Amino acid sequence: MNITVLAVGTKMPRWVDEAVAEYAKRFGRDVAYALKEIKPEKRGAGVNAAQGMAAEEKRILEAIPQGAFLVVLDERGKAPTSVELAEHLKSWRQNGEHVCFVIGGADGMTDRLKQQARMMMRLSSLTLPHGMVRVFLTEQLYRAVSILHNHPYHRE
């Protein structure tokens, strides 16, 4: 199964990169996992949030793998349980889907990008730092895979 995470933002703290790498290597051969950073648009004089999100949208759309099942992370999305996420992964794998998760920038993402998604998912009702979202999402994806393999990592 192929999973791509597109995350707006670069230059994360070392602990973020290390944590994501740790969970990514745990997937093993069953999952081809890739995290791709999308350059954020600089904010400041003459660039408002809407313009910034539009520029980031263009970069995101260019980075989405051809034919991927698009899942955007958004505070208005559905928050699945770990078991429900595992069921989604199982279905996507059975359908041969390449799944692409998108983590928006500091101002979020455009409505147009959200409308193109086949699923909107919320990780938490809390506001989380972008680096933490990368770690949290990757860990939950690993947890979902471990559930599908009856691995003892996840306990009910």
From Swiss-Prot:
Keywords in alphabetical order: Cytoplasm, Methyltransferase, rRNA processing, S-adenosyl-L-methionine, Transferase
Positions contributing to S-adenosyl-L-methionine binding: 73, 104, 123-128
EC number: 2.1.1.177
SUPFAM superfamilies with a match to the protein in the record: alpha/beta knot
Major place of residence: cytoplasm
NCBIfam families, A to Z: PRK00103.1-4
Family indicated by similarity: Belongs to the RNA methyltransferase RlmH family.
Protein name, as recorded: Ribosomal RNA large subunit methyltransferase H
